[in-house]
Amino acid sequence: MSYTIAAQIRTEIGKGSSRRLRHANKVPAVIYGPGKEAISIVFDHKDIINIQANEDFYTTDLTISLDGKDVAVRVQDMQRHAFKPLIEHIDFKFA
């Protein structure tokens, strides 16, 4: 199954800005890979919480729609809240 997630590039980096994003029901994330510069992104929590429950979300390539461009990525790491059903941060790797 193919997944497409709409995201925006984030300009504010750091702990404070990430906390503000999480408070606004957004998920900060980063896309990185060898030979390419890392891209900090943000997307809505509701866009990711339901599709991450599927097993193939972690094993197949995903498409992130980023400012009109489609970027193929794969989930590298996901940080979750300790006891709430929230995703706090996701690391993607270029596919």
From Swiss-Prot:
**Single biological process term from Gene Ontology:** translation
**GO MF annotations, alphabetized:** 5S rRNA binding; structural constituent of ribosome
**Signal peptide region:** none
Is Signal one of the keywords?
no
Q: Which UniProt keywords apply?
A: Ribonucleoprotein, Ribosomal protein, RNA-binding, rRNA-binding
Please indicate if the UniProt record lists Transferase as a keyword: no
InterPro entries assigned: Rbsml_bL25/Gln-tRNA_synth_N, Ribosomal_bL25/Gln-tRNA_synth, Ribosomal_bL25_short, Ribosomal_L25_dom, Ribosomal_uL5_bac-type
Q: Which GO terms describe its cellular component?
A: cytosolic large ribosomal subunit
A Pfam family of this chain: Ribosomal_L25p
Name the domain of life this protein comes from: Bacteria
What is known about what this protein does?
Answer: This is one of the proteins that binds to the 5S RNA in the ribosome where it forms part of the central protuberance.
Say which family it is in.
Answer: Belongs to the bacterial ribosomal protein bL25 family.
Fill in the subunit field for this protein. Part of the 50S ribosomal subunit; part of the 5S rRNA/L5/L18/L25 subcomplex. Contacts the 5S rRNA. Binds to the 5S rRNA independently of L5 and L18.
Q: What is this protein called?
A: Large ribosomal subunit protein bL25
Q: Which organism is it from?
A: Shewanella piezotolerans (strain WP3 / JCM 13877)
